[in-house]
Regions:
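Mid-domain alpha/beta scaffold segments of enzyme catalytic cores
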Residues: 1-226
C-alpha cells in the first residue's frame, strides 16, 4: 500500500459524508480560526489553531483584546486532533503594526513550546524578522513557514537553523530543490481550489522525482512529527 498524501496546510475540511475513500489515502492539517468548532472524528484529519496576523488589527485600539483568545487556544491544544499551533507570524502588508504582531506571535510561540506542538507560520515580507526571532527564543518545537515563495538563499538560511518550508501552488523552484535535499520540505494546498494531488505532481515535475517517492518521504517526516 502506498503512502498517503500529506496536505500540511489547508483551509478546506474534507467532507466525510461524501469522500469516504479520500481518508484512506490522504492526511490533512486543516487550519482553523480560534473560534471554530473542531470535529475530532474525521479520519486522518488534524488541525492547527492560532491567531492569524490578519486578525491582529483589532489589537491596535484594544491591546489586550486577545488575552482571552490565547487562553481559549491553550485550553483546546491538548486535543489529540490539534497537531499544530498557528498559523501565526508576521505580515508587513496586513494586520496590526509589527510590535503588536510580534507580541501575539510570541504568545503563540510560548503555547507551542508549552504544549509541545509544532508552529505553522505565516510570513509576508518579514523573513529576516522571523529568523531573528527564532534565533532569540531557541524553540524546541518545529517551525514551518507555509506557502514559501522566496529565493533559495533565504531558504538555506532558514533551514540551516532548523526551520521547515511548506510549498503550495506557487513557489521558487530552486528553493524547493534546497528544501527537498535538506529534508525540510512539506506540501500544501492552503486556500486554493487545486487538489493536493496536483501540488504533488507539480513538485514531482520540479524535482524530477516520482510522486510516490515524495509521498513516502513526507509520510516518514510526518510520522516523526507526531
Amino acid at each position: 500500500m502506498s503512502a498517503p498524501y500529506i496536505n500540511f496546510h489547508t483551509h478546506h475540511i474534507p467532507d466525510f459524508s461524501v469522500e469516504t475513500d479520500y481518508f484512506d489515502t490522504h492526511i490533512s492539517i486543516v487550519n482553523l480560526d480560534y473560534s471554530d468548532v473542531i470535529n475530532p472524528n474525521i479520519p486522518n484529519t488534524y488541525y492547527s489553531i492560532g491567531i492569524h496576523p490578519w486578525s491582529t488589527v483589532c489589537a491596535t485600539d484594544a491591546p489586550n483584546c486577545f488575552d482571552e483568545v490565547i487562553e481559549e487556544i491553550r485550553k483546546k491544544l491538548p486535543m489529540k486532533s490539534i497537531l499544530c499551533v498557528g498559523e501565526s507570524g508576521f505580515d508587513a502588508l496586513r494586520g496590526a503594526n509589527s510590535d503588536i504582531q510580534r507580541k501575539l506571535f510570541l504568545s503563540q510561540i510560548r503555547l507551542s513550546e508549552k504544549m509541545h506542538k509544532p508552529l505553522i507560520i505565516h510570513c509576508v515580507k518579514m523573513l529576516s524578522e522571523t529568523l531573528e526571532l527564532y534565533k532569540s527564543v531557541h524553540p524546541t518545537q518545529p517551525w514551518i513557514i507555509h506557502g514559501y515563495r522566496n529565493k533559495a538563499e533565504q531558504a538555506k538560511q532558514l533551514m540551516q537553523h532548523g526551520i521547515y518550508l511548506s510549498f503550495g501552488t506557487k513557489f521558487n523552484e530552486a528553493s524547493m530543490h534546497e528544501a527537498w535535499e535538506a529534508n525540510k520540505m512539506w506540501l500544501e494546498t492552503d486556500a486554493s481550489e487545486r487538489t493536493i494531488e496536483e501540488v504533488y505532481q507539480t513538485a514531482s515535475d520540479c524535482l524530477q522525482v516520482p510522486v510516490e517517492t515524495i509521498k513516502e518521504k513526507l509520510y516518514q517526516q510526518f510520522t516523526q512529527l507526531i
